[in-house]
Amino acid sequence: MNILIPTVSPESVEALVFDLGGVLLDVQLQRTLWAFEALDIRGLGAAEVIDGNRACFRDLELGLITQEEFAEAVRRTFPAVAAIPDEQLLEAWNAMLMPFDAQRVELLRELGKRCPVYLLSNTNLPHRIRFRESFRERFGGSFDELFVRCFYSDELHLRKPDPEIYRSVARQIGTPPGKLLFIDDNAANVSAARGEGWQACHLTGGITVTDLFEL
């Protein structure tokens, strides 16, 4: 396995840790904003949803509320959707998730034969139910089985870029932080990982994860 990242020596990497959204799975947030607008939820921006600046989104991603409580919180926050059932709100919330790319799935399978591969994702139960179902329908089997272990923010009750999530994950993996290579599309998450001693790559500028490895 050759890692095509100038600052990383393959010999220095004992395990790979991938982000999900924007790295392994394309996410189009605008689709969810449009779906919410169609339900008469207006004025939401990316920062409120992705950065968790509204409590209902943040708490869902931290696993502090159930998906039913999330739907109820959305109805309380936006009275225009007071009569909208959970299913419609969750469908709009999941609209951002795009289909898995076959090349990226194959890359994960091949990388997993060469070194331990992990997932570290800020996500939530409704999204996880949907992307697992999408993966199973297209590729068969379990998405989570592509990894030695998946670390999900709502199960850890921690979110990137909180430094504690990197400490916790490194402890649970059992590999020195300097031997972990983390790949994420969010600059703050990458910076925080480096601050905890991880090697990290910011996936940006039109580069995809399949461009980073030569098998």
Please report, for each region that a protein language model flagged, where it lies by residue.
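Asp-based, Mg2+/Mn2+-dependent phosphohydrolase catalytic module
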Residues: M1-L16, L125, R130-L215
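N-terminal helical cap/lid subdomain that shapes the substrate entry/recognition surface
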Residues: T7-A102, K113, N124
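Generic structural signal for small/hydrophobic residues in well-ordered secondary structure
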Residues: D19-G22, G63, L111, L119, ...
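Residues at alpha-helix caps and immediate loop-helix transition turns in enzyme cores, especially N-
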Residues: Q28, T32, Q103-R104, R130-R132, ...
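Catalytic-core regions built around general acid/base machinery
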Residues: Q103-R114, L146
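Short amphipathic alpha-helical segments and helix-helix/interface helices
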Residues: V105-R109, L119, Y166, V190
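Proline-centered loop/turn at the N-terminus of a beta-strand
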Residues: P116-Y118, Q199
